[in-house]
């Protein structure tokens, strides 16, 4: 019995140390995504992403992107947490779009289309957004979301893995260089895909990289690279994790051209 108590105590201590290491933001995400959501899906007989789309279709105004964003934010605040960029960080994204007025934007990670709607609604006539999404179900929901918002002509959805699609952009999708890249996919892909964009000649002097979730869940290797390279000028925007009072942030990295990876 004492041995069992000691073992339990050590297990609890290890769990607490793990939680401290991960941070409560990641723990909260884990709880929502891997505990509550599967139970909810089982009870409802559908997926969270389908429920978000249905809520938008029932509560937003067709052809009105702002009402689509507000409906998604309402659902994710009041009903189920979801990994959209959210309104707090979304306002930072809006400011960046307005400042640089990009003609060609690449988004890595579409999810349900929230950020695609958010960016596309601010693009100038003739500008376009390419969004890459590996999950075919998410890609289908993003297309329906864009159709409902009336933005389908501004956005092209590319279904597949970013590392496979990026090398195809020049020949298959008529891309010379990109004006802006929004990174919001797998966090361990931020750095490899940034390097791949450089290697493929898709970045020009002045290309804006805007990366979400650089604090939670965090992208330490990406931040170390862009902040430590004279190829980028970086600005950090502190904010909150979507729909939570957990500190997160966006990183803006403006490409300066190829150079030494170490700043002098």
Curated annotation (Swiss-Prot):
Entries under Gene3D superfamilies matching the protein: Vaccinia Virus protein VP39
GO MF annotations in UniProt: catechol O-methyltransferase activity; magnesium ion binding
SUPFAM superfamilies in UniProt: S-adenosyl-L-methionine-dependent methyltransferases
Residue numbers on the Cytoplasmic membrane side: 1-2
Protein family per UniProt: Belongs to the class I-like SAM-binding methyltransferase superfamily. Cation-dependent O-methyltransferase family.
Modified positions (Phosphoserine) in chain numbering: 259-260, 264
Regions crossing the membrane: 3-19
EC number: 2.1.1.6
Residues annotated as binding substrate: 187, 213, 242
Positions of S-adenosyl-L-methionine binding: 85, 107, 115, 133-134, 160-163, 184
Gene Ontology cellular-component terms listed: axon; cell body; cytosol; dendrite; dendritic spine; glutamatergic synapse; membrane; postsynapse
Residue spans, topological domain Extracellular: 20-264
Domain of life from the UniProt record: Eukaryota
Name of the top EC class for this enzyme: transferase
Known catalytic reactions: a catechol + S-adenosyl-L-methionine = a guaiacol + S-adenosyl-L-homocysteine + H(+); 2-hydroxyestrone + S-adenosyl-L-methionine = 2-hydroxy-3-methoxy-estrone + S-adenosyl-L-homocysteine + H(+); 4-hydroxyestrone + S-adenosyl-L-methionine = 4-methoxyestrone + S-adenosyl-L-homocysteine + H(+); 2-hydroxyestrone + S-adenosyl-L-methionine = 2-methoxyestrone + S-adenosyl-L-homocysteine + H(+)
Post-translational modification: The N-terminus is blocked.
GO annotation terms (biological process): artery development; behavioral fear response; catecholamine catabolic process; catecholamine metabolic process; cellular response to cocaine; cellular response to phosphate starvation; cerebellar cortex morphogenesis; cholesterol efflux
Function: Catalyzes the O-methylation, and thereby the inactivation, of catecholamine neurotransmitters and catechol hormones. Also shortens the biological half-lives of certain neuroactive drugs, like L-DOPA, alpha-methyl DOPA and isoproterenol.
Name of the protein described by the UniProt record: Catechol O-methyltransferase
Signal peptide: none
């Amino acid at each position: 019995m004492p041995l069992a108590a000691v073992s339990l105590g050590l297990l609890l201590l290890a769990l607490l140390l793990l939680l401290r290491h991960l941070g409560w933001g990641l723990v909260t995400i884990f709880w929502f995504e891997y505990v509550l959501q599967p139970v909810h899906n089982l009870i409802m007989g559908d997926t969270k992403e389908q429920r978000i789309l249905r809520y938008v279709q029932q509560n937003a105004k067709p052809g009105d992107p702002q009402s689509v964003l507000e409906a998604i934010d309402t659902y994710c605040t009041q009903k189920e947490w979801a990994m959209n960029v959210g309104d707090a960080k979304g306002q930072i994204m809006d400011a960046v779009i307005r400042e640089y007025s990009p003609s060609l934007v690449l988004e890595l990670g579409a999810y349900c289309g929230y950020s695609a709607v958010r960016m596309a609604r601010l693009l100038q006539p003739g500008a376009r957004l390419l969004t890459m999404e590996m999950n075919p179900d998410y890609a289908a929901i993003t297309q329906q979301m864009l159709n409902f918002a009336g933005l389908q002509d501004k956005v092209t959805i590319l279904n597949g893995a970013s590392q496979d699609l990026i090398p195809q952009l020049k020949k298959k999708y008529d891309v010379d260089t990109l004006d802006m890249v929004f990174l919001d996919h797998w966090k361990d892909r931020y750095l490899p895909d940034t390097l791949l964009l450089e290697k493929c000649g898709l970045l020009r002097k002045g290309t804006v990289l805007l990366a979400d979730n650089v604090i939670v869940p965090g992208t330490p290797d990406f931040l170390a690279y862009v902040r430590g390279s004279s190829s980028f000028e970086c600005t950090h925007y502190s904010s909150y994790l979507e729909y939570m009072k957990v500190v997160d942030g966006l990183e803006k990295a403006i490409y300066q051209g190829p150079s030494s990876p170490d700043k002098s």
